């Protein structure tokens, strides 16, 4: 029978629930258990696809095309599993489904209410995710903090799960903050006590407390929390600030958190073999080189908007024994006059995805600088589209080359709306989303980066594409289309072969990178950037 673990948060948001959940998932997986994981987001949006990156951060796309919370990226990278549309559930999705059923008459004339209809739908989403993956354990994180009005239906559903499934099959983990008051010289447990009190008032008694802290938590403090929160002292787990996130699973294991979970859920599983993970941590903490990458974006004020890109760069750096120094460059501030001064010291230049016309010309200037000065370059999604626009303007000679997304009236629309997108009115969930195949051209830098495979699979999130009526003209001027869809209709990857590394892709390679298995195109870019640095 599937076991259910629910992770909630208290005191403050952004406390690291997602990393705790992902780390526990890794520990249980390394015990030989089949693990899946999901995130509940209490906002009313159906998904984050139309939300501003400034409000939500990155939108993480799964293989099946779901636009999801960035925590799913942490889950996939830590546990090394591919998630799906059932792994991220929002209030908007729940209410949409309940209202759809009501309109179809599936409730047989009943008055539709939060309890039982909304809570039943929430529970159905939990059990469906577990059933689809045949998981031994499903971990469900609830976004926000206990006390938020938006999360009440989710917490009520979690409370009901214990009665539905039995106490031996359900476990509650509560993550909180223990602030340190320098003036008093002590840690304060009262916020955690009140958070647990609030959770218990909703009918949920946590089995484990994970306390976020800057400093070590004394045994006396743990005993105090155990007494007031009614948990065992050994179930008060310290989550101290660490140098790298990859230390957290090992820190939790050192405190027997995974064993406590297995004991409570009556899971007979061998101890987790974390040898490979420990070697990864050792490598990460002792990198000998440093590579500087200029990340030229329009949302750089909020690094979470590019979190998978940053993590994928780090993964690639691990393979070269190199730390990655990110130079965050606001594309709105780049001009032809200051671009050399601003990004001239970078070992490599990366232009990531985005939407809209703000900051576009700055991205184009960064790409021009990379091409003209042979600085290793990687363009992703919008970065690929702007690389084609820059090539059209400054190499092909189409001075008014542009994108129909940012200028619908442009004459030379190098980037145009995909044919199957022309009559779509709704913005949400209508992009080209999910995993698609890409056929590689032999003898290219792209093919070499992928180990000379014929076809690769990558995740996409876009509405516009390269306009094929310009393909021959661009090829005649030196741009190589090194990756296309199997039917040859969609340009997936372009490159300039005589450069050290000038590659741009329509898909999002960062979404499938893993700490022990870096995405190959990004690894090729980082390798070229490091070689560029060493040749200076």
Curated annotation (Swiss-Prot):
Amino acids binding CTP: 13, 148-150, 188-193, 224
InterPro entries: Class_I_gatase-like (IPR029062), CTP_synthase (IPR004468), CTP_synthase_N (IPR017456), GATASE (IPR017926), GATase1_CTP_Synthase (IPR033828), P-loop_NTPase (IPR027417)
Entry keywords, A to Z: ATP-binding, Glutamine amidotransferase, Ligase, Magnesium, Metal-binding, Nucleotide-binding, Pyrimidine biosynthesis
Residues that coordinate or bind ATP: 14-19, 71, 240-242
Gene Ontology biological process terms in this record: 'de novo' CTP biosynthetic process; pyrimidine nucleobase biosynthetic process
Binding-site positions, Mg(2+): 71, 141
Binding positions for UTP per the UniProt entry: 13, 188-193, 224
Pathway involvement of the protein, from the record: Pyrimidine metabolism; CTP biosynthesis via de novo pathway; CTP from UDP: step 2/2
Subunit and interaction comment: Homotetramer.
Family: Belongs to the CTP synthase family.
The protein, known as: CTP synthase
Gene source species: Enterococcus faecalis (strain ATCC 700802 / V583)
Gene it is expressed from: pyrG
